[in-house]
Design a protein with these regions (language model features):
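A generic structural signal for short hydrophobic patches within well-formed alpha-helices
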Residues: 11-12, 41-44, 78, 121
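Active-site neighborhoods of divalent-metal-dependent phosphate/nucleic-acid chemistry enzymes
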Residues: 2, 46, 68-114
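Histidine- and aromatic-rich ligand-binding microenvironments
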Residues: 7, 37, 94-96, 117-118
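A general structural signal for well-ordered alpha-helical segments in protein cores
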Residues: 23, 37, 41, 54, ...
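Acidic, metal-binding active-site segment of PIN/NYN-like and related structure-specific nucleases
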Residues: 100, 104-134
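Short, well-structured N-terminal submotif of metal-dependent ribonuclease cores
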Residues: 1-36, 46-63, 90
Length: 134
């Protein structure tokens, strides 16, 4: 069974109801296939702070993510981070810090990253990436 780690931008699209692609995929996946991670939590909670009523936005994020399995940045992810960052630096293809942390968590836990930002994630060696925006 393929398990997915949705990047922050995929959740934002879902929360704003702007696209049906993410919603359609989520409707056909079992709850056990969809996961989250501490970095995505941090980014979504930070984004909630930008709204007029941040408490309401945080509640929406919690209702959405709390039922999902959560992966933290642990030692296995740290090892993947070190290898990936070294390879990216050597190739001159740096990606954003949070994206690399998310990618490392996905690699450590055999997850496929779902993101609208596939160009950046596809630079990470060995990472499986899908774009559900269409």
């Amino acid at each position: 069974m393929i398990r997915y780690l949705l990047d922050t931008n995929a959740w934002i699209v879902y929360l704003k109801g702007r696209q049906t692609g993410v919603r359609s995929h989520l409707e056909v996946c079992s709850r056990h296939q969809i996961t989250t991670c501490s970095i995505v939590w941090a980014e979504l909670l930070h984004g909630a702070r930008k709204y007029e009523n941040p408490t309401e936005r945080e509640s929406r994020v919690e209702r959405l993510l709390l039922p999902l399995e959560n992966f933290d940045f642990d030692l296995a992810a740290a090892r993947h981070y070190a290898v990936s960052r070294h390879a990216l630096e050597k190739a001159g293809m740096i990606i954003g810090l949070n994206d690399l942390l998310i990618a490392s968590i996905a690699l450590a836990n055999d997850l496929t990253v779902v993101s609208n930002n596939t160009d950046e994630f596809k630079r990470v060696p060995g990472l499986r990436v899908e774009d559900w925006s269409a």
